[in-house]
């Protein structure tokens, strides 16, 4: 089984203490790519420690950036902040176009795909340590290299 965790973010970002308030502009976030995710996607940790538990991440990507079919161990909630995105659900075949304020929730192990239809930013919230498991067309787990090397 191939599992990508967000542990690498601990080296890039300083997690906020739970008892501290914070307010910052989008331009003050420190975005960075993460191994195991498409190079087009960059992340900034807003709260929590995604390698250890519940967290909120701000994801940013250019038009056409695709995070291919995958699932997570935690429940994931996504809210688009800017631009437009498409969220596709494998089990229902549902594809939803979301603009600012658009919301999607994927329960644990729910296979989905996320695409920035235009340059987009979205909050990604998870209720436990964040991971990503890529799947092939039949739903079998595949290594990130295989998922990310496919032409979109």
What are these model-derived regions, one by one?
Residues 1-8:
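Sec-dependent signal peptide recognition
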Residues 16-55, 137-152:
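A short, N-terminal "cap"/entry segment at the start of jelly-roll beta-barrel domains
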Residues 43-45, 56-58, 77, 95-97, ...:
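Conserved hydrophobic/aromatic beta-strand scaffold that supports enzyme active sites
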Residues 49-51, 62, 85, 90-109:
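Short acidic-glycine-tyrosine-enriched beta hairpin
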Residues 99, 108-132:
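Ligand-binding loop in jelly-roll beta-barrel domains
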């Amino acid at each position: 089984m191939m599992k990508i965790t967000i542990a690498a973010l601990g080296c890039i970002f300083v997690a906020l203490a739970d008892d501290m308030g914070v307010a910052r502009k989008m331009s003050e976030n420190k975005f960075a790519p993460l191994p195991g995710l498409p190079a087009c996607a960059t992340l900034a940790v807003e709260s929590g420690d995604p390698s250890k538990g519940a967290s909120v991440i701000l994801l940013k990507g250019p038009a056409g950036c695709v995070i291919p079919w995958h699932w997570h161990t935690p429940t994931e909630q996504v809210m688009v902040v800017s631009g437009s995105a498409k969220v596709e659900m494998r089990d229902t075949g549902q594809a939803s176009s979301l603009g600012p304020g658009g919301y999607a929730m994927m329960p644990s192990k729910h296979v989905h795909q996320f695409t920035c239809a235009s340059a987009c930013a979205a909050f990604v919230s998870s209720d436990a340590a964040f991971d990503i498991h890529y799947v092939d067309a039949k739903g079998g787990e595949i290594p990130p290299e295989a998922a990310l090397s496919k032409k979109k």
